[in-house]
Amino acid sequence: MKVEIIKCLEDNFSYILINEANRNCCVVDPGEADPIINYLQKNKLNLKYILNTHHHNDHVGGNKELKKKFDAEVVGYIGDKNRIPQIDICLSDGEIWKKDIFEAKIYHVPGHTIGHICFHFFKNKLIFTGDTLFSMGCGRIFEGSYEQMYNSLRVLKNLDKDTKIYCGHEYTLKNSEFCLAQDSNNNELLNKIKEIKEKIKQGKTSMPSTIGEELNCNIFLKSNDLENFKKLRDLKDNF
């Protein structure tokens, strides 16, 4: 399975997952349709599934047009069936979704929203975390509680360290500034910041990261106490 990163809107990431044998593909969190359509047509791909991590418009804005144009099925969390546009397949926490070569375990990770999920393609050792886990950050808490977000991150931090992380936004450098302010003597963090700056200078994105890198550099994953996590999240909201 090949993963292509598609930049959408101002700073969103969508992802196209490709079966190179038959050219079938999925798209994760299409914030808008046009960049997805352009890539699919240019590369002669067949869009079969639209995977949504949560209901926010910058992650589902392309659903309607993509479904209409390609007759793709929309996949999302059962608890968000009334909020995800055009949803066809409703999934629950712990369920395995399997179509074609695509196989993912669903993690319900409330915090940013009540109905947020991650798609863990465990055989490929990669996970799409939407706005729950960012590189060197985590999502703002809009609907859930601090405790829910803290527990959701605890679930993700227990994945294999070489699991690749693909998140929903290019927030990495801004996030790194906050991590550095809290953890200024972290050499692994300093090295990762240099690496990311070089990637962006070359016109690339900061994706993917890995669970191992985030355990070393992400101040929110390094937190092992709910009160400490709450303090950090409040500080970041005003950083």
Where are these regions (language model features)?
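Active-site-adjacent loop/tail segments of enzyme domains
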Residues: 137-162
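Core dinuclear metal-dependent hydrolase active-site scaffold
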Residues: 16, 96-122, 126-127, 158
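Accessory terminal helices/loops
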Residues: 154-164, 173-239
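Histidine-centered catalytic micro-motifs
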Residues: 50-60, 109-115, 166-172
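Active-site metal-binding loops of divalent metal-dependent hydrolases
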Residues: 30-32, 55, 79-80, 112-113, ...
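Divalent metal-coordination and catalytic microenvironments
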Residues: 17, 29, 54, 66, ...
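Active-site HxH/HxHxD metal-binding segment of metal-dependent hydrolases
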Residues: 25, 32-105, 195-199
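Conserved beta-strand hairpin/beta-sheet module of binuclear metal-dependent hydrolase folds
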Residues: 1-43, 119-130
